[in-house]
Regions:
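N-terminal glycine-rich phosphate-binding loop and ensuing alpha1 helix
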Residues: 1-54
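Residue-level signal for inorganic ion chemistry
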Residues: 30, 85, 97-98, 128, ...
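SAM-dependent methyltransferases
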Residues: 1-10, 33-36, 179-180, 197-199, ...
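Acidic metal-phosphate-binding loop of nucleotide-sugar-dependent transferases
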Residues: 99-103
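Short phosphate-binding loop-to-helix
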Residues: 61-94
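Conserved core of the sugar-phosphate nucleotidyltransferase
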Residues: 104-194, 224
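Hydrophobic packing residues within well-ordered alpha-helices of enzyme cores
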Residues: 55-59, 112, 133, 211
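Short, high-confidence coil segments that cap the C-terminus of an alpha-helix
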Residues: 40-41, 91, 119-122
Length: 224
């Protein structure tokens, strides 16, 4: 199965430009994500209008050969970026990423492609929950320890058949959009694959120091 990666850069980042463009460990989250995705797939960056010029400027001087930039319709929310990305894709399967997850584990995109080849229609990397999970009452008093054996943390990137993602996007016209919630609401079966213990969602610039430390401990592609 050949997949195309879609990387949305929605309007919300117009108020949080550091989360896209500010360097962490020498590389911006945008370039780090594109570099990791391009190692396994063609990449379509689908960007809201106010951020389009900055994204184009950030790519200048990078030696990307499999990356295209498309501009979403207004108002440029995540769902509109995904629609624009899908319109630019000519493969039957796609991988969707989120810039708030700036590190992508080695082999994750390949594992997604394998699951899609085996006829999964929605594929998401996940890891077991290892923290102790507690239940509390309305007053904040701890009442029980929950069984975590069936709990998973779901990560990015996420794979879909292009038709299924288009169906989910078409149903959701505006507002916050999460592919997992949309798939579950639509009754779409979701296949989980092995995720990455070091993948995490970060809030930049707040978490920049932590992210830099994490990057320093893992085998990261060299800056080019």
């Amino acid at each position: 199965v050949t997949v195309t990666a879609i990387l949305p850069v929605p309007m919300v980042f117009a108020r949080r430009r550091d989360a896209v463009f500010a360097a962490v460990a020498g590389v911006s989250p945008l370039i780090r994500a594109v570099r990791a995705l391009e190692a396994a797939a063609d990449v379509v960056i689908a960007v809201a209008v106010p951020l389009a010029d900055e994204v184009a400027e950030a790519l200048v001087g990078q030696s990307f050969s499999r990356v295209r930039v498309v501009v979403s319709d207004s108002p440029g929310e995540r769902v509109h970026c995904l629609a624009a990305g899908l319109a630019a894709v000519d493969t039957s399967h796609v991988v969707v990423h989120d810039l708030q997850w700036p590190t992508i584990g080695t082999g994750v995109v390949d594992r997604i492609a394998v699951a899609l080849r085996e006829e999964a229609v929605a594929v998401m990397p996940a890891r077991p929950v290892t923290d102790s999970v507690k239940a509390v009452d309305s007053g904040g008093v701890l009442t029980a320890t929950l069984d975590r054996s069936q709990l998973r943390t779901v990560q990015y990137p996420r794979g879909f058949t292009a038709d299924v993602l288009a169906q989910l996007v078409h149903r959701h016209r505006s507002g916050p959009f999460d592919e997992l919630e949309a798939a579950l609401s639509a009754g779409i079966p979701v296949t989980l694959i092995e995720g990455d213990d070091e993948a995490l969602r970060v809030e930049l610039p707040r978490d920049a120091g932590y992210l830099a430390a994490l990057i320093a401990t893992r085998q990261d592609p060299p800056v080019r």
